[in-house]
């Protein structure tokens, strides 16, 4: 089925400010930051360590509140929502991939991908079918019964990606998803991410130090003086 791009950003950060207390001083990480993520678009977030990449991802993913400003998801302001409402949006609209796969070691690849769907209350038969479909799409159809310890690093990350998109989110947020992988494996994982963006029209924001991979994405942004700036 042909996807139609949304008229509003999937996620929009407007004038976001975030500060932390550091000893007796205040450290300003974001100060008036703006960022729009659109359906079907991949965005690389490249900045030095400590510049605020993880903070930006956490705020965009509703894991952290900004001190000022607003985060819109699908055009809806989130600042006035309850914790339960924010959690519901994270479960349905936002997928996360981390540098460490964070898979549950006692579960198989299939069960790890089924879990987010079961938390939403979907039937086991539905979750099983969708999990198998996603894993097969990512080239893991013959590895679904294996536990994380029985998989390679690249396979573990592809299972983590499958888990992140299990609930068909609007946006995928990834924090250094290839940081622990060798160049060849990192390329395979990156291709899997881009394949999903094209197939599902999910918006994707990846924090990365890998400039070669960043150069293959639709947009590149950085954080400078608390602002999100477009590169190129």
Swiss-Prot record:
CDD domains xrefs: ABC_MJ0796_LolCDE_FtsE (cd03255)
Enzyme class per UniProt: translocase
Keywords, alphabetical: ATP-binding, Cell inner membrane, Cell membrane, Membrane, Nucleotide-binding, Translocase, Transport
Subcellular location as annotated: Cell inner membrane
Domain ABC transporter, chain residue ranges per copy: 11-231
Domain of life: Bacteria
EC number: 7.6.2.-
Keyword Cytoplasm: no
Assigned GO CC terms: plasma membrane
Binding sites annotated in the UniProt record for ATP: 47-54
Topological category with respect to the lipid bilayer: Peripheral membrane protein
Signal peptide bounds: none
The protein's assembly and partners: The complex is composed of two ATP-binding proteins (LolD) and two transmembrane proteins (LolC and LolE).
Function in brief: Part of the ABC transporter complex LolCDE involved in the translocation of mature outer membrane-directed lipoproteins, from the inner membrane to the periplasmic chaperone, LolA. Responsible for the formation of the LolA-lipoprotein complex in an ATP-dependent manner.
UniProt protein name: Lipoprotein-releasing system ATP-binding protein LolD 1
Species of provenance: Rhodopseudomonas palustris (strain BisB18)
């Amino acid at each position: 089925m042909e996807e139609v791009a949304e008229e509003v950003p999937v996620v929009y950060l407007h004038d976001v400010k975030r500060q932390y207390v550091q000893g007796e001083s205040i450290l300003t990480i974001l100060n008036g930051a703006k960022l729009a993520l659109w359906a079907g678009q991949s965005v690389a977030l490249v900045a030095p360590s400590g510049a605020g990449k993880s903070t930006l991802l956490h705020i965009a993913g509703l894991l952290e509140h900004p001190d000022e400003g607003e985060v819109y998801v699908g055009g809806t302001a989130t600042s006035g929502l309850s914790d339960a409402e924010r959690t519901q949006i994270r479960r349905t609209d936002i997928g996360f991939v981390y540098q460490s796969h964070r898979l549950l070691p006692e579960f198989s690849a299939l069960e790890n991908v089924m879990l987010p769907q079961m938390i939403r209350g979907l039937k086991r038969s539905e979750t099983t079918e969708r999990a198998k479909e996603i894993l097969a799409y990512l080239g893991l159809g013959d590895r679904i019964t294996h536990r994380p310890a029985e998989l390679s690093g690249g396979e573990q990350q592809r299972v983590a990606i499958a888990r992140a998109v299990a609930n068909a989110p609007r946006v995928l947020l990834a924090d250094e998803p290839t940081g622990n992988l060798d160049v060849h494996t990192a390329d395979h994982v990156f291709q899997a991410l881009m394949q999903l963006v094209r197939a599902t029209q999910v918006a994707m924001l990846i924090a990365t130090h890998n400039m070669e991979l960043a150069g293959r994405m639709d947009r590149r942004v950085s954080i400078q003086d608390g602002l999100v700036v477009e590169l190129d």
